[in-house]
Structures are given as structure tokens and as C-alpha cells.
Amino acid sequence: MQKEALRYLQNAKELLSKTAIEEGIYVDKKYVKSACGVAYLGVLEAINAYLLKRGVPKKDLPKKVEEYEKALKKYATIHNGKLPRLFDALYEELHIAGYYRGMLHRVDTVRSALKGAREFIEKLK
């Protein structure tokens, strides 16, 4: 359900509110990493809900990023051919750069990534 995916984004914003900002940069990267991870989970939750609505059995939902890419190409390209590319960008920004490597520090960069996640989720109605 899209509502649940958006709740993940709200949780990500709450995590970010726990760290100070100095000169446009988040001070505590632990909260930034956590927020990026939670936001990415929201994206995955939205895809799962979309696939379930399209008749994909719960046991057949994707478990790896490559499987999510294939599922989007198979089920969502008809409605919006840009979704697989947007998903790839969110995977790289939120999961890899933000969560896994902890490379996102600037407030505007993180906010832009969260905005992109929200837009992606809203396109999966």
C-alpha cells in the first residue's frame, strides 16, 4: 500500500530531525545513513504493493535489486517507461551512496533524494 511506503518516508524525515545541521551539512552521519536506508525501504514497499495489485503472488515478490528492476520492466513499463531508470537512480542514491557508503552529507542532496523517493512512490498508484 502506498500509504505504508509514505510512512517509511515520514520515518526517514524524523530520523534526519535528530541531527544538527551546520552550514548546510548534517552533523551526525549515522542518522543520515539510517534515514536513507529507511527511505529506500519505502521505495521497495511501494514496488511490492504495486506488484501485489498487479496479481504477483506474495511469495514471488522480488528479493534482489536485479529482480526489482526486472519486475518494474515487466509490470510497470506499460504505465510509465521511466520507472526502471528512476528506481536505479534511487537505488544508487539512497541505498548505495546514502546508506551503504554514507556518502551523502549535504542537506539539499538528501532532501532531493527523499523528494525523488516520494515522487517515485506516487507514480506507482
Language-model features, listed with the residues they occupy:
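Terminal alpha-helical segments
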Residues: 1-125
